[in-house]
Curated annotation (Swiss-Prot):
GO terms for cellular component: extracellular space. It is found in: Secreted. Disulfide bonds join 78-126. The gene is Il2. Cytokine produced by activated CD4-positive helper T-cells and to a lesser extend activated CD8-positive T-cells and natural killer (NK) cells that plays pivotal roles in the immune response and tolerance. Binds to a receptor complex composed of either the high-affinity trimeric IL-2R (IL2RA/CD25, IL2RB/CD122 and IL2RG/CD132) or the low-affinity dimeric IL-2R (IL2RB and IL2RG). Interaction with the receptor leads to oligomerization and conformation changes in the IL-2R subunits resulting in downstream signaling starting with phosphorylation of JAK1 and JAK3. Its main location: secreted. This is Interleukin-2. GO terms for molecular function: carbohydrate binding; cytokine activity; glycosphingolipid binding; growth factor activity; interleukin-2 receptor binding; kappa-type opioid receptor binding. Glycans are attached at residue 23. Belongs to the IL-2 family. Keywords: Adaptive immunity, Cytokine, Disulfide bond, Glycoprotein, Growth factor, Immunity, Secreted, Signal. It holds the Pfam family IL2. One of its GO terms (biological process) is positive regulation of regulatory T cell differentiation.
Length: 155
């Protein structure tokens, strides 16, 4: 009788310990989200900047805006602002000769990751460069920004 109660007590204690134990530090979690964002951006860039992409010249006519200075997580608001335009460009250029697999999923993943990193509030006002960028320049710049933030975190 007592052994059953003791076993239940031990099981409940273990459940409480497991559920209350932190899985990772906030800094580690932030770094993991940044690395996922970086990976998603790199996959999109590889899909677009591909020698088989016959639609690339058309894609380069669309212009995107980059932040003047992006060094912190709050600057990811500027990326989020341009995701709709990026999605439209990717949707327009889908064809039999060029199909970026799961472009919509990558954009959704990027959007979710950005919200996790910067928070859901949109109080930050982006200051954009005067010169617009092509889709390739846009993705390369955001890749560099993510790499810079990650390297700052690991120092």
């Amino acid at each position: 009788m007592y052994s059953m109660q003791l076993a239940s007590c031990v099981a409940l204690t273990l459940v409480l310990l497991v559920n209350s134990a932190p899985t990772s530090s906030p800094a580690k979690e932030t770094q993991q989200h940044l690395e996922q964002l970086l990976l998603d951006l790199q996959v999109l860039l590889r899909g677009i900047d591909n020698y088989k992409n016959l639609k690339l010249p058309m894609m380069l006519t669309f212009k995107f805006y980059l932040p003047k200075q992006a060094t912190e997580l709050k600057h990811l608001q500027c990326l989020e602002n341009e995701l709709g335009a990026l999605q439209r460009v990717l949707d327009l250029t889908q064809s039999k000769s060029f199909h970026l697999e799961d472009a919509g999923n990558f954009i959704s993943n990027i959007r979710v990751t950005v919200v996790k990193l910067k928070g859901s509030e949109n109080k930050f006002e982006c200051q954009f460069d005067d010169e617009p960028a092509t889709v390739v320049e846009f993705l390369r710049r955001w890749i560099a920004i993510c790499q810079s933030i990650i390297s700052t975190m690991t120092q």
